[in-house]
Amino acid sequence: MNEIERQILAEVSLDAPWALVEDYARMPRWRPEDVNGGVDHLVAALGRHGVPVQVLEPEIYLSIPLHAAVMVGNQSYRAKPPSMSISVPNGIEAELLYLRTNPKTIRSYTRDPSEIFLDGGAELAGRVKGRIVIMEGFANPGTCSLLEEWGAVGVIAVNPGVDIHWGTCTTIWGSPDLDDLPRKPKIAVVAVNNPDGKQLIAAAAEGKKGRVVTEMQEGWFKQKLPVVDIRGKADPDRFVFVHGHLDSWDVGVGDNATGDATMLEMARVLWKNRDKLKRSVRIAWWPGHSTGRYAGSTWYADAYALDFDANCVAQIDCDSPGCRWATSYHQTTTMSETEAHVMRAIKDITGIDGKPKRPNQAGDYSFNNIGISSYFMLSSTMPEGLRAEKGYYAVSGCGGNIAWHTENDTIEIADKEILMTDIKIYLLSTLRNANDDVLPYDWRATAQEFGRTIEAYQKAAGAAFDLAPAKAALGSLSAALDKLYAGIASGKVKQKAANEALMRLARVLVPINFTREPRFRHDPAYTCPPLPTLATASELATMPARLVGFAKTQLMRGQNRFCAAMREAEGIVAQAMA
């Protein structure tokens, strides 16, 4: 840690961030007007510290849950509809069908029925048509879209505990465009708690009918979106982008008032020390994360896409830091090229060795299709031993606290000491990303990840498909990357050329590893495997014979895309070394 880093970290205080946490703990931020009020409160806090802020006002598409219930006979059960369920205030009635789900995938966004269900795969479709399906877990978009495709008229997700969790059931990322609209959910979806769910499962076993009622407020809403731009001195056009969602379910303290507070303190400290920044730092707080499936960050990615393409060196997602008992960093989200940078920051602040985790198709990772090196989504979390001791099931925020997405995500979920630690981790990693002479990325690590992925796919495919061209293209890029980093170390490759290459490589290598859709579009909100254009190779061995020819055709085209990407990346390296 250098002197500037030590000095800036020493200025971190909990005064401003904890005040915001306490205020937001009394301010629900899920209805559109309440989110705008939360933004006004944040803008006032920034103003008190002299931090200038621009407030944008996009119109984004939201679906706000108002009411839900499940009825069987004369018995009524409390329920919550996820965002983007259809609204059926008069209810929809059908026979109940229970499908056992795999407890290991209850928080997965997969659409693979063999991974989701315990009693079969695609052959279950015939049983689903015209039924209201009851399943354990959450109303995940992949599962709900699959059941809709199979003809279900409704879904009841039986949450694992005594509380009901809010969520969303759409696979559409952000506000829909015309191409997305066919995937807009067309069935009623609700969640119930576990005790009630067991009664509903018993009713399904008796062949009973159920009625699902949902009431939603849906449409286009003008939402405030605050952005702080702290200009660097040496290379002000290039920027590190830090962001997180301001809207939450209910008061949402651990998810995500603590994240909003973290970014407030980062803005305060970095603005005060702006003369020490080489590159710029931009910070944004999102509306539409919860009720718009990341609609705020998606709008911003669309509206400023060309600026991101030309100038963004990293995106850093700040979600659920500073929660009680979250003292472990064993599930830290990071792409391979930023892994060493992230792990070093965690080690320098905490003395703990973190463990990296591939980014999910979740959070506000709305920038993958542009191609931005990315890290963090969730940072600190509860140690696995403590989670097991408490009997907690897996959730996707609040540091592992099962208050996530419930009314119980209140002030007790935040922890001052852990919040201070997480603020410093976010601040140090951002500061280094802005100030390192050469961007702290190792694309050789990404190439090694690609190599492991291709080997796994080739092993699964066996003799059915040859990935040798992909291996060769990757090998050529890997050799070029070795020369690039040797040139950077020796000074043969100048810093400006090196940084341009390290940034431009993300525009090629991030999309090929995380997206199926073209650049400047958005992939669906369900699981995307590594190197998705080659991923069909892993399915060949179990694929019905009638589909193998089609799969090989897809793989041929996918391998072409991969090899072309490797060639393009190699060209970026060659230009830097010219």
Stretch-by-stretch model annotation:
Residues 2-15, 19-127:
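Noncatalytic luminal/extracellular "stalk/propeptide" segments of secretory-pathway proteins
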Residues 142, 222-225, 248-337, 441-444:
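Acidic/histidine-rich catalytic neighborhood of metal-dependent amide-processing enzymes
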Residues 282, 384-449, 539-578:
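His/Asp/Glu-rich mid-to-C-terminal helical/loop segments that flank catalytic regions of hydrolases
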Residues 87-117, 175-254, 264-275, 280:
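Soluble metallo-hydrolase cores and metallopeptidase-like ectodomains found primarily
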Residues 83-182, 186, 353:
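Extracellular/luminal Protease-associated
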Residues 443, 450-578:
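Mature extracytoplasmic or organellar-lumen-exposed domains after removal of signal/transit peptides
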